[in-house]
Amino acid sequence: MWAKRATRILNLERSLWFLLCACCATIKAPKSTNHAPRAAIAHTVMRLSAQEKKIVPAVTDVDELVVVPARAVYLGSDFAKAAEDPGDWALERDQTSSEGYVRSLVEHIEIGVREAARNPHAVLVFSGGKSIDAGAVMTRASSYWQVARANDWFGVDAKVASRTFTEEHANDGFEHALFSVCRFFQLARKFPSKITVVGFHVERARFEKLHLDAMGYSWSNMTYIGTAAVNENELATREAKARDAFARDPYGCRNDVGSTLDPFNERASYSSTVKSLKSFWTYLDACPRRRYAGRFPWSPGVALI
């Protein structure tokens, strides 16, 4: 009797199992779309002007901007010996005229050249306008370019010369950063995805936490290559004052920042050539003390077309 009952139970379990399998087979699996996941959609679109779209880029296939802020003008006759002739440099009043200091300036030029040579997709920009002490003879940026050429581009691949340019209007740290980005746009018709700045290491915090922040660039996209200065203590004191000034006045449009502020009244033309920053230029015209709250062409979620 118990054997027959066990057999009936076993047959019942089998029947239930087959019924369950049949029900599962009738459930249709969702169709596969075979589509890759969608990329993040830009929330804001900024458009190039018709004039901007017609301009042929001077350089292509580039994405990194290497900036060397130019600090002085070399007035000597032999640019190849610029590091040896401190007396032939038109230095600002608060700069030391020692040989060690001018060697540091030439070192910055060389580092910039070597950094650009390491990356074939990099553009090197020497940035700096005219100096009061040098008069209207030459811009600081042009002087740096001449030193690099006279030193045969410091022995690196000569092709780096075709990717080296000047930005000849900047007069303070914020302008070095912003105007060099604008110069990159003029050359490549797009904005850089990475920025490398060469300077004294005591200035690193100002560039990272003040200047880039004021123009909406992510710190993670910036590399700062800093060197020691022969007048380290003196430079650190001046730098602390500069940081305090830019913290109060992020765009450096007031005299308390201490820059030369366009001494020859030669206004930069970037507001007319980089029209995708139109709203930002308008904001700067009011000489604001607060950071711009709008979006930039390089802001996350923005597409420039």
Task: Give the role of each language-model region.
Residues W2-S32:
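N-terminal signal-anchor transmembrane helix specifying type II single-pass membrane topology
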Residues T227-I305:
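A structured, mid-to-C-terminal "fold-capping" secondary-structure block
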Residues L12, H35-A36, P263:
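Short linear motifs in intrinsically disordered/low-complexity regions
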